């Protein structure tokens, strides 16, 4: 039996204050059913970051995984772009 393809999302890290956890904001373009206008929706996901390597502002790829805690069902796959530190 094959495992189904897991969901993958791309977003920006908005919080890294927890130990081994990051909060990733993912933006989705959705068309309004009645007014046919494109709306940008933002959803936040808590993701597991084993080595605490992601920082605020980084662009990251997260993948769905087994439940790690009450709110965490995603894990960090890779950091695609580092935030610019001023």
Swiss-Prot record:
One Gene Ontology MF term: structural constituent of ribosome
SUPFAM superfamilies: Nucleic acid-binding proteins
Keywords on record: Ribonucleoprotein, Ribosomal protein, RNA-binding, rRNA-binding
Gene3D superfamilies on file: Nucleic acid-binding proteins
Coiled-coil intervals: none
Keyword field contains Isomerase: no
Complexes and interactors: Part of the 30S ribosomal subunit.
Function summary: One of the primary rRNA binding proteins, it binds specifically to the 5'-end of 16S ribosomal RNA.
Organism lineage: Bacteria, Bacillati, Bacillota, Clostridia, Eubacteriales
InterPro entries listed in its UniProt record: NA-bd_OB-fold, Ribosomal_uS17, Ribosomal_uS17_bact/chlr, Ribosomal_uS17_CS
GO process annotations (BP): translation
A Pfam family annotated for this UniProt entry: Ribosomal_S17
Any single GO CC term annotated in Swiss-Prot or TrEMBL for this entry: cytosolic small ribosomal subunit
Membrane spanning stretches: none
Entry-linked NCBIfam families: PRK05610.1, uS17_bact
Cytoplasm recorded as keyword: no
Protein name: Small ribosomal subunit protein uS17
Family, per entry: Belongs to the universal ribosomal protein uS17 family.
